[in-house]
Amino acid sequence: MPRFITELKRTHSCGELTKADIGKEVVLFGWVNNRRDHGGAVFIDLRDRAGLTQVVFEEDVRPDVHELAGQLRLEYCVGVRGKVVSRGGNVNPKLRTGEIEVHASDLEIFNRSEPAPFQIEDEIDTGEEKRLQYRYLDLRRAPLQRTLMTRAKVNHLTRNYFTDGGFLELETPFMVKYTPGGARNFLVPSRLNPGKFYALAESPQLFKQLYMMAGFDRYFQIVRCFRDEDLRLDRQPEFTQIDVEMSFVEQNDVFDVMEGLVVKLWKEVLGIEIPRPFQRMPFEESMAKYGNDKPDLRFDMPHVVLTDLVRQHDGGGVPLMHEAVKGKGIVKAMRVPASANFSRTEIDKLEEYVKGMGAKGLARAKVGEGGEWTQSPLAKTITPALRQAINEACEAKPGDLLLFQFGKDSVVHTVMANLRVHLAKRMGLIPEYGSGGAWRFLWVVNPPLFEYDEESGQWAAAHHAFTRPHDSDLQFLESDPGKVNCYRYDLVLNGFEIGGGSIRLHDPEVQARVFKAMGISDEEARSKFGFLLDALKMGAPPHGGIALGMDRLVMLLTGAESLRDVVAWPKTQKGTDLMTGAPGDVDARQLRELYVKSTYEPK
């Protein structure tokens, strides 16, 4: 064992010594972050997760220690003993320890390091693949260490908050029964049950509901979940969520608990007071104004739905608008304030941008002093009455730019939603991380329970089939499922959905009606969810809950650009681990024991 480990104990971290410690003898452990040899003295910056401390090895004080220090190189892992002294006029204001240095009297090299494949510095230009390949080195960099320490703090605060609130931290199984539909599952073959598979849980949904039926009326868990889906910057195949369920609650009770957690996290982590209650917006309003159910409210520029207006004016001389409203399409406009000075080139770039999302083009009009439209093909045919009505609906002013989309609602919503954010970034309307107005929380409520699947010709649950419909909409379950809204809610922050949940169905008869509306027979429902249906008949309480995405929450709290920056050991966008080589091949004997055979043929 190293001498420093058995004979000495670390007294301080490398980030905590100040001028108040001058004169103390200290023992520090860490890595050589920087090294400078001035002949009679060797200087190093010693680093651990708390920060940096300058250490000086002087030849005329301890020649043997100075000689050993001459062997030090970057990333050597060492222990140092010495006295804290003032740096006098050589203060480094960038460091918390910048007023002092440690004059070493002893040194032990715990381990040497080969030259690192990249610099261990805050800002590096090394490609992400190389950093992920050597993730254990990447994690030595201060920005990532700060992020993971923030994540640990969020874990700690979350556990304390729920425990203090009377919640029980309970576990749920990772290996569960596979049920078709929903997210694609990772499958685990069962050696003891040949030909059968477990699925890795994509969420604890059913088990946390069963906890409520078992009488554990306040549950939480910080839980790992798994989804085999295509990856993006804000997705990982394994992810962590803060999972919560409560009995004897309605929607507002869930909001109150979760707002309390969020306010605590922002206060304790960032020192920022978030006002309560959070804004609430019906799903229908969110789609109409912003084109999606997770709007970024840090800036304005809402959409205006003009469908009824255009219909009232019988198309108003614009054939494409008329065609859209005659069918099932919609017409939307967005006012871009004081932007009539956009050049033709800039407008053309916007048009190329929307075409990349499936739009046929980008109709536009610049508003003149008298409300007339200029530099717009629409101006040639639109009736004055419709033009004036659109100006009034959009609250258009001279110098504004109006942008239009018309056609299939799903395309129009998506195009206009993305265009709004694209323009806001370009125009500098989005507050920077950490600035005033940087946090806009929103509950999006009352969405449809079902969405129509044109391919199968069936109604499907928009989220999951265990959400309680509005009582006033139960009459439509059989006759018109598209009219059924539900007690589902999403917590949105700055254009990201950071959590979602619902009040659950606890009435077995209504649950059966929901399954039938989805074309699920009694036999199929019993095959997939028989255990839940039985539990619902055993005095199931009213209950509801939510799950917050821990990874995304920390990403937003820290201002990270990607989930891979807040997960210690992330996968790439292809789902691979470049450090360990996962996923990898499996021994043929093990596959035989699992009764599994690969049919994959490399191209």
Curated annotation (Swiss-Prot):
User: So where does ATP get bound?
Assistant: 227-229, 236, 497, 549-552
Catalyzed chemical reaction(s): tRNA(Asx) + L-aspartate + ATP = L-aspartyl-tRNA(Asx) + AMP + diphosphate
Q: What is its EC number?
A: 6.1.1.23
> Region (Aspartate) spans which residues?
205-208
Task: State the Pfam families in the record.
Answer: GAD (PF02938), tRNA-synt_2 (PF00152), tRNA_anti-codon (PF01336)
Give compartment(s): Cytoplasm
Keywords from UniProt, A to Z, are:
Aminoacyl-tRNA synthetase, ATP-binding, Cytoplasm, Ligase, Nucleotide-binding, Protein biosynthesis
* The keyword Cell wall biogenesis/degradation is assigned to this record: no
Listed GO CC annotations: cytoplasm
GO terms of biological process kind: aspartyl-tRNA aminoacylation
Keyword Protein biosynthesis among record annotations: yes
Superkingdom in the source lineage: Bacteria
Which positions in this protein are listed as binding L-aspartate?
227, 463, 504
Looking at the UniProt record, the site noted as Important for tRNA non-discrimination sits at 38, 89
- Kindly list the GO molecular function terms attached to this UniProt entry: aspartate-tRNA ligase activity; aspartate-tRNA(Asn) ligase activity; ATP binding; nucleic acid binding
This molecule's function is given as: Aspartyl-tRNA synthetase with relaxed tRNA specificity since it is able to aspartylate not only its cognate tRNA(Asp) but also tRNA(Asn). Reaction proceeds in two steps: L-aspartate is first activated by ATP to form Asp-AMP and then transferred to the acceptor end of tRNA(Asp/Asn).
What protein family does this chain belong to?
Answer: Belongs to the class-II aminoacyl-tRNA synthetase family. Type 1 subfamily.
Q: How does it assemble?
A: Homodimer.
Q: What is this protein's record name? A: Aspartate--tRNA(Asp/Asn) ligase
Species annotation = Anaeromyxobacter sp. (strain K)
